[in-house]
C-alpha cells in the first residue's frame, strides 16, 4: 500500500480503510479472530515505524479514539513500541473529537488559522469552515 511509503506529515480517513485495507483483508480466508489480530499487529507496527521520526522519546503514548478501548491493541502497541500506553477517561476518549471540532469552530469564528500544514500535509496553514448567520 503506497500510503505507508509517503513522507510525513500524512493523515488517514475512513475511506482509506474501506478502499485500501478492507479489500486486502477480505482477500484472505483466515478466521475473523486471525484477521483482527493481524490488523492490531499491523497498527502497532506502523505506529512504531512512525514513532522513529518523532523527536520526543517519552516513555508513554497517550491514546484516544476507538482503539483506546481495545486492550489487545494496546498490548500490541506496548510490545512493538516499548512504551506504556496511557488511556484517558472514557469521557475524553468519547468526546475529544467534538471538542477539537468545537475549538476549530471558535478559531474559524475569530478568523484565525485552524488547520496547520504541519499536521495535515497541506501546502499552507488555512482557515477552514463556513459560518452561517
Functional labels for PLM-detected ranges:
Residues 1-44, 110-111, 120-133:
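Conserved ATP-utilizing enzyme core subdomain
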Residues 21, 47, 51, 101-105:
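Buried hydrophobic packing segments
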Residues 30-34, 86-93:
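A short glycine/serine-rich beta->alpha loop
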Residues 43, 77, 98:
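Hydrophobic, well-ordered secondary-structure elements that form the walls
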Residues 49-59:
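Phosphate/pyrophosphate-binding loops at sites that engage ATP/ADP/AMP, CoA/4′-phosphopantetheine
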Residues 58-77:
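Glycine-rich phosphate-binding loops at beta-strand->alpha-helix junctions
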Residues 80-81:
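Short, structured coil segments at secondary-structure junctions
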Residues 89-133:
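Glycine-rich phosphate-binding/hydrolytic loop that grips phosphoryl groups
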Amino acid at each position: 500500500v503506497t500510503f505507508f511509503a509517503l513522507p510525513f506529515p500524512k493523515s488517514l480517513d475512513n475511506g482509506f480503510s474501506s478502499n485500501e485495507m478492507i479489500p486486502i483483508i477480505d482477500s484472505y480466508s483466515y478466521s475473523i479472530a486471525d484477521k483482527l489480530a493481524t490488523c492490531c499487529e499491523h497498527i502497532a507496527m506502523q505506529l512504531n515505524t512512525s514513532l522513529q521520526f518523532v523527536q520526543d522519546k517519552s516513555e508513554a503514548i497517550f491514546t484516544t479514539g476507538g482503539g483506546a478501548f481495545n486492550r489487545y491493541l494496546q498490548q500490541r502497541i506496548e510490545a512493538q513500541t516499548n512504551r506504556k500506553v496511557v488511556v484517558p477517561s472514557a469521557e475524553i476518549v468519547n468526546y475529544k473529537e467534538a471538542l477539537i471540532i468545537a475549538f476549530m469552530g471558535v478559531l474559524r469564528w475569530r478568523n484565525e488559522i485552524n488547520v496547520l500544514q504541519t499536521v495535515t500535509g497541506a501546502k499552507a496553514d488555512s482557515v477552514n469552515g463556513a459560518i452561517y448567520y
